[in-house]
Amino acid sequence: QAKQYLDANEAALQKYRELCRGMDCDFEEKTAYVYSLNDRRKIERELDALEKLGVPGEFTDRLPLPFPVAGAVRYPNQAQFHPLKWIAAISKSLHICEHTPVRELVGTTAITDYGKVTANKIIVATHFPFLNKHGSFFAKLYQHRSYVIALENAPNVDGMYVDEAQTGMSFRNYKNLLLVGGGDHRTGKQGGAWQELRDFAQRHYPKAAETSHWATQDCMSLDGVPYIGPYSASTSDLYVATGF
């Protein structure tokens, strides 16, 4: 299963490379790092798993971050792009109906307030799957929130960095900005963790200035693996993509 998940991600990355070719969406090949502040053994186990799967990965404990790490896995040949620019570019070749909520799905027919749309196949990619009578996704997903600040006059870290701990921090650059993420938590708890990130930036990047901040809220699966595939065993030609 791990190999299947890996192969699916590699295939998706290659597809994005093809789609982004010639597209104005700031696509960049980058090296990704997963680091641990205090658990070198966890990083070594990750490297062992990669070796068994035949995936190139390297150990390093030298990162351009403002704190020491116990170790990190270095993944070459990864990528990042600007999602809104990508959507704006690819939407030029699509038919998009805005302000048209789907009230119900009957087979492969979507029922709206303005009429019906019938297709050969339907993919529900609505963040949270809205069809509750199939799939039981309400019991298999939880809401997860995280925070980001963008800093100018901050270092170029030349890569994408994420802590293996869910409560850790992430770092990457976009043009002349450093994006610092963290403060992750399930919804329902007190949020607004930007101040935690601002305090971190003040300590470690005192010459930097915040240009913007935002939060993300995602539907996450119970084991961290997205649900992508048939909506349920009883719904043919109906698919779902959620949990990421």
Regions found by a protein language model. Name each.
Residues 1-61:
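Dinucleotide-binding Rossmann-like beta1-alpha1 core, especially the glycine-rich loop
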Residues 4, 31-39, 77-80, 100-102, ...:
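Conserved short loop/turn motifs at secondary-structure junctions
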Residues 19, 41-51, 70-121, 125:
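Helical element adjacent to the flavin cofactor pocket in flavoenzyme catalytic cores
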Residues 24-34, 59-89, 183-184:
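Helix-loop-beta segment of a Rossmann-like dinucleotide-binding subdomain
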Residues 29, 61, 98-100, 104-106, ...:
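Short loop/edge segments at beta-strand edges and connector loops
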Residues 49, 165-166, 175, 186-244:
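C-terminal catalytic lobe of FAD-dependent flavoproteins
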Residues 96-99, 131, 156-162, 207-213:
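Acidic/polar loop patches that form or flank catalytic/metal-binding clefts of enzymes
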Residues 105-174:
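Flavin-dependent oxidoreductases
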